[in-house]
A protein has these predicted regions:
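N-terminal Sec-pathway targeting helices
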Residues: 1-11
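Solvent-exposed, non-transmembrane regions of membrane-associated and secreted proteins
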Residues: 12-301
Length: 301
């Protein structure tokens, strides 16, 4: 009995130490983000009041999306098929119309004085508000936004994404922390109902070179194991060479989506995907997929 008691005590101590370390890491990660957040907030200027354009119908869903339990194929969108890969690629802008010289905004100049890896700022009202960094795809899995070793990690842009070009598809990764840190808050799109989606359908992702808003068109739980029927290598679709490839990607993520939205997605739209682990299985990913608000649309409803 004394041996059993001692063993239980050791297990308790180990668990307690692990739990303390877990919350210490989260606290440090939040402090690192908070420091950058203060810098970012201080550099933001309120725009002059202007008339707000009426939102385009395709920028907001027109009906409450219904949660689905099993994937169903969606109707194929009728699009003009490009004759060549070059023709298809030309549907995306070759540069930033409002920033052809690729000038880094003052906000990010100040942020990069604290960490040169800062490339963007991601926010969803009442859901998340975090800096986005970029290096290789492993560093910020184990380092916080200040670059310090930390198991909580930080949000980071996939290493394949080149912000110097208006990349057709941006992917941001982050840990799914149980108490909501990093991308832990994204699980709300999975666990809550369609009303939550409707109230939090818009994403702001400002980068070194542009400020942009996106509207969510799908929320999907997918596999990254090629043997599974719901396998989707979302990270491999940085660019699209033809209509078939575009339809395959957009069609698959819509098919697997928890919601059926009225948000249309067309070639030439710039996509943004937020990716995090889903559950205990390392092969599962929760994806929140959005497309950029088009000129003339508004995220205001």
């Amino acid at each position: 009995r004394p041996v059993l008691t001692a063993a239980c005590a050791v297990v308790f101590v180990v668990c307690a130490v692990s739990l303390i370390r877990y919350f210490v890491d989260i606290g440090r990660a939040r402090s690192a983000s908070d420091e950058l957040r203060r810098t970012y907030a201080a550099s933001q200027t309120l725009p002059e009041e202007t008339a707000v354009p009426a939102p385009a119908e395709t920028a907001v869903e027109t009906a409450v999306p219904e949660p689905v339990s099993t994937p169903e194929a969606l109707p194929t969108q009728t699009q003009q098929t490009a004759e060549t890969a070059a023709d298809f690629a030309s549907q995306w802008a070759a540069g930033y119309a409002n920033n052809p010289q690729l000038r880094i905004s003052e906000s990010f100049q100040k942020l990069r004085q604290q960490n040169r890896d800062v490339v963007g700022w991601l926010s969803i009202a009442e859901v998340l508000d975090e800096p986005v960094l970029q290096r290789d795809n492993s560093f910020y899995l184990t380092h916080d936004a200040s670059g310090q070793k930390n198991a909580t990690g930080a949000l980071f842009l996939d290493e394949s994404c080149n912000l110097r070009l208006p990349t057709p598809h941006l992917v941001i990764h982050g840990h799914n922390m149980k108490e909501g840190a990093m991308f832990g808050s994204l699980k709300k799109y999975k666990l809550k109902d369609a009303a939550f989606y409707k109230e939090h359908a818009f994403i702001t992702f400002n980068t070194l070179y542009e400020e942009a808003q996106y509207v969510i068109y799908a929320v999907a739980d997918v596999s990254i194991d090629a043997k599974d029927a719901d396998y989707l290598p979302f990270w491999a679709y940085g660019t699209f060479t033809d209509q078939a490839q575009w339809d395959a990607y957009v069609g698959k993520i819509r098919e697997l989506s928890r919601y059926r939205t009225q948000v249309d997605v067309q070639p030439g739209d710039r996509l943004l995907t937020l990716a995090t682990c889903s559950g205990a299985d390392n092969s599962r990913r929760l994806l929140v997929a959005a497309r950029q608000i088009r000129k003339g649309e508004s995220s205001l409803t």
